[in-house]
């Protein structure tokens, strides 16, 4: 071949058809099915950087089901559409993290569960590799957030429960309590008021577990006025 590539395999009508092996001079290699000079069917492609794809091909691109082995130690098993990870799949990270769910154009997109090696888990909606939409995040220490997400952070309405017994239900902005919310401590005491960037801010009412008012007043950025 003019480009230094070498093909060993079956031919039909002067075209690569059937089983065959192609070695390129840059070190790439494909072994598998061919149809009319293009990769079509099942095949394994080895990249010069050490990556490897083993799976379905259609019209010379990855299409169907396949496994992609990254030289970094990462691995993807799942659906491909026109050369991109699209559909359902599992992505294993070399560090022990794992994502199971939907992909779109190579990114986590749709519904999916991400489990971190440290034990944290997120189950919910994704968009462009980021937590986006409704989802539940459980920290490795047992704290849980259930609510709205945007750009990988709690944004919107949600509920945060800690293992220490505290519960907050209300607004969030960029991961912090923001807007109107209700905070309940482990003894059942209830704080109803407003928050700004994680601090109490604005008028509030505190009641005990029986509903008796303990305190009323106003906070200004975390300080009682």
Regions found by a protein language model. Name each.
Residues 1-225:
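Glycine/tyrosine- and acidic-biased, solvent-exposed loop/turn segments at the edges of beta-strands
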